[in-house]
Regions:
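SAM/dcSAM-binding transferase cores
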Residues: 142-187
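Mobile active-site "lid"/loop adjacent to the S-adenosyl-L-methionine
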Residues: 67-92
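A short acidic, Gly/Pro-enriched loop at the edge of an enzyme's catalytic core
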Residues: 52-63
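Conserved SAM-binding loop of SAM-dependent methyltransferases across substrates and taxa
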Residues: 2-15
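Conserved SAM-binding motif I beta-strand of class I
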Residues: 17-22
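Conserved SAM-binding loop
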Residues: 31-32
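Conserved SAM-binding strand-loop segment of SAM-dependent methyltransferases
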Residues: 39-51
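Conserved Class I SAM-dependent methyltransferase catalytic core
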Residues: 88-148
């Protein structure tokens, strides 16, 4: 994508070295430009890579993925970015277990309907669910997304809910507090 998640991670962890990868050449160009314009540019790197075939001698403390949300054959404008054709959850989990440290974390943002399957899949690769955030678009609304964090090291499971809007076009205090260092806007 644009490198937004990497930029946010860099802002929160100023000493972290961040490698972003994407299979889409235009996305890599855009992320590269955004990284160059960032005050964190020395800690950010982007490469045109297919994660399935990603080779490295390094291990990572954190792998973050915001994968495509639509299954194959769904109607979508940007087919590659919106289909689980190039990188499916199995590929993601399997490759991540190869490159995270023993105490490392795999963090996946995904549609709520995929959460149960991804939890089962992670267990197949000896990953423990250590954190689950249930994301609601609006207070009282349906569960939309989950952030699932897995580790090779077993830890107590943390579960929390996160609400983006308390009413239409009115951000929740929770959202404003979390994003206050990334935006300037009023309540």
């Amino acid at each position: 994508g644009t490198g937004l998640i990497s930029l946010m991670l860099a802002q929160r962890n100023v000493s972290a070295k961040i490698l972003a990868i994407d299979i889409n050449e235009n996305a890599v160009k855009l992320a590269s430009e955004n990284f160059r314009n960032s005050i964190f540019n020395e800690n950010l790197k982007v490469e045109l890579k297919d994660f399935k075939n990603f080779e490295t001698n390094e291990n990572f403390d954190l792998v973050v993925c915001n994968p495509p949300f639509f299954e194959k054959n769904a109607s979508a404008k940007d087919v590659l970015a919106r289909q689980q054709v190039e990188l499916n959850f199995r590929n993601l989990v399997e490759k991540s277990t190869e490159i995270i440290t023993k105490k490392g974390i795999l963090s996946i943002i995904l549609p709520s309907e995929a959460a149960t399957d991804v939890k089962s899949l992670a267990a197949e690769f000896n990953l423990y669910l250590v954190r689950e955030i249930n994301i609601y678009g609006i207070e009282g609304g349906n569960l939309k997304r989950n952030i699932l964090e897995f580790s090779l090291a077993q830890k107590p499971l943390e579960i929390s809910d996160f609400v983006i809007e308390k009413s239409p076009r009115k951000y929740s205090d929770q959202y404003l507090n979390l994003t206050k260092n990334f935006h300037v806007f009023g309540k």
